[in-house]
Swiss-Prot record:
Name listed for the protein in its UniProt record: Heptaprenylglyceryl phosphate synthase
EC number: 2.5.1.n9
Pathway assigned in UniProt: Membrane lipid metabolism; glycerophospholipid metabolism
Subunit structure: Homodimer.
A molecular function (GO) term: heptaprenylglyceryl phosphate synthase activity
Organism from which the protein derives: Staphylococcus carnosus (strain TM300)
Ligand binding (Mg(2+)): D14, T40
Keywords associated with the record: Lipid biosynthesis, Lipid metabolism, Magnesium, Metal-binding, Phospholipid biosynthesis, Phospholipid metabolism, Transferase
NCBIfam families (alphabetical): GGGP-family, PRK04169.1-1, PRK04169.1-3, PRK04169.1-4
Membrane-traversing stretches: none
Name of the coding gene: pcrB
Pfam families reported for this sequence: PcrB
Amino acid sequence: MYDIKKWKHVFKLDPAKTISDEDLDKICMSETDAIIIGGTDNVTEDNVIQLMSRVRRYPLPLVLEISNLESTMPGFDFYFAPMVLNSRDVTYHNGILLEALKEYGHMMDFDEVIFQGYVVLNPDSKVAEKTQANTDIDTQDIEAYALMTDKVYRFPIMYIEYSGTFGDMEKVRAAKDNLEEAHIFYGGGISSISDAKAAAGVADTIVVGNLVYNDIKQALKTVKIKGKS
């Protein structure tokens, strides 16, 4: 079994977006620690299967971020189940999970299901709109969400999502300082190696997504944050 707490860098691929075989090969052979498949819009059974089958040729961990029931399927090493803590809609806190458990609970391997305390912080992002996230939160709120993740729910991961813009690293640090057991993931707006280094200086794991499609060369450079130390 893979140890998620050793991951420093992961690429997130959107099944609704197009990526060439050449670029996918570069991503999967880049020494990233894992690939996450997930997105906000138009995530379907067909496009998840297609992308999964292409990535499965490579010997690295493959994760499905659960966004809807239709596209949830066997064949992944892990399933990330985001509990959007600052959502105003219970659907994105435990509603999707409830439906998944009703449908697949009898066959789930819960060692593969990783629950995340997920906090969305970019008010202009699609994910904030879809989940009805309250993004108007301060450092004290972030600290409380960290305690909620770590001490109340005891989720193994807190995921801070700025989706589309580079975030406030002081808020990420405030969350990190209030976690004892949970591992912190950061995603959002990483568009250069300098952004990647700044995020990696605070978060345990950085997630690089849109940059794969916007500038593959810059995306590949972000793997350098792993270093050789």
